[in-house]
Amino acid sequence: MIILPAIDLKEGKCVRLYQGDFKASKVVAEDPIEVALKFKENGAEYIHIVDLDGALTGQIKNLSIISSIIKTINIPVELGGGIRNLNTIDMLIDAGIERVILGTAALNNRGLVEKAVKKYDKKIAIGIDAKNEKVAINGWLNISSTNYIDFAKEMEKIGIRNIIFTDISKDGTLKGPNLNQLKKLNESVSCNIIASGGIKDIEDLKVIKEMDIYGAIVGKAIYSGNIDLNEAIKIINKESSR
């Protein structure tokens, strides 16, 4: 299982949200490039970045910082937030983004997903953010009537191979992930599932790994000191090699 440390960008700084509430954002680091470098030094093989300003406005807002991170760390980066059209996807892939995450756009525009997958294949991922099992869109401000499992199955048919799943009620809470919803999703599709939201300690990571989940995104637990990234990667890798 791969561990992806998270950088959420708001106005050029690293922040953390609580249950997806933008009003409850807290700055955890002033310099995202420094944070990314530290993640790399601690063994990260992949970094998860969200442009929160982009998620709200529908346009990438922190591209210069994101580009600097990519050039500085030289390890794969996946990016979500505000990616609504093929031109933006083209621009991000050209900028060096390894995997582009579509959320709102995927629910509102299935044709975009089809075109993007046809052009970029596994470089396109889907972010499913759910509240009470319904898919949330527009920076988590609106809850659709679409069930998260149904949406995942539809995306799999289009050709999506990677799904990032977040239970919004768990995000930023350090209360543990929604294991029940994760299990159901992992059993419903053959895509790689990346768990996100609520992961609080190494024990959560061990449980997720035992569920045969492909990856786990860790944010607040690293910034708060609950999880030592270097130690977590070593432990999970050690268990993988058994």
Swiss-Prot record:
<dbReference type="InterPro" id="IPR006062">
    <property type="entry name" value="His_biosynth"/>
</dbReference>
<feature type="active site" description="Proton acceptor">
    <location>
        <position position="8"/>
    </location>
</feature>
<comment type="similarity">
    <text>Belongs to the HisA/HisF family.</text>
</comment>
<keyword id="KW-0028">Amino-acid biosynthesis</keyword>
<dbReference type="InterPro" id="IPR044524">
    <property type="entry name" value="Isoase_HisA-like"/>
</dbReference>
<dbReference type="GO" id="GO:0000105">
    <property type="term" value="P:L-histidine biosynthetic process"/>
</dbReference>
<dbReference type="GO" id="GO:0005737">
    <property type="term" value="C:cytoplasm"/>
</dbReference>
<comment type="pathway">
    <text>Amino-acid biosynthesis; L-histidine biosynthesis; L-histidine from 5-phospho-alpha-D-ribose 1-diphosphate: step 4/9.</text>
</comment>
<keyword id="KW-0368">Histidine biosynthesis</keyword>
<dbReference type="InterPro" id="IPR011060">
    <property type="entry name" value="RibuloseP-bd_barrel"/>
</dbReference>
<protein>
    <recommendedName>
        <fullName>1-(5-phosphoribosyl)-5-[(5-phosphoribosylamino)methylideneamino] imidazole-4-carboxamide isomerase</fullName>
        <ecNumber>5.3.1.16</ecNumber>
    </recommendedName>
</protein>
<dbReference type="InterPro" id="IPR013785">
    <property type="entry name" value="Aldolase_TIM"/>
</dbReference>
<dbReference type="Pfam" id="PF00977">
    <property type="entry name" value="His_biosynth"/>
</dbReference>
<dbReference type="GO" id="GO:0003949">
    <property type="term" value="F:1-(5-phosphoribosyl)-5-[(5-phosphoribosylamino)methylideneamino]imidazole-4-carboxamide isomerase activity"/>
</dbReference>
<keyword id="KW-0963">Cytoplasm</keyword>
<feature type="active site" description="Proton donor">
    <location>
        <position position="129"/>
    </location>
</feature>
<dbReference type="InterPro" id="IPR006063">
    <property type="entry name" value="HisA_bact_arch"/>
</dbReference>
<keyword id="KW-0413">Isomerase</keyword>
<dbReference type="InterPro" id="IPR023016">
    <property type="entry name" value="Isoase_HisA-like_bact"/>
</dbReference>
<dbReference type="GO" id="GO:0000162">
    <property type="term" value="P:L-tryptophan biosynthetic process"/>
</dbReference>
